[in-house]
């Protein structure tokens, strides 16, 4: 299992740390360089975490993709990315609903919404 994180803020950092400290089996985690300091720290801290060159590289190389960006950034970057039907996408983006995600990512992509409270 290859995991990818688009966005490297508090939510992504917490989830990545939790996964790396758990017994979940995975090959590697690719992360975006959205927040360069957090990305570098995660890459140094965990041996299976790598910084991707682009968001599309994350989509191309991972079968589970976590969307951890603000709604504004999500609306800017998601339409440019090419997902495949065998991927699973977990969205932490509070104000982009399931119908909007399906329209943007493609109807065959499996999408799970996981909204943190309070939404940020």
Where would I find each of the regions flagged by the language model?
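Rossmann-like NAD(P)(H) cofactor-binding subdomain of soluble oxidoreductases
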Residues: 38, 46, 55-60, 64-120
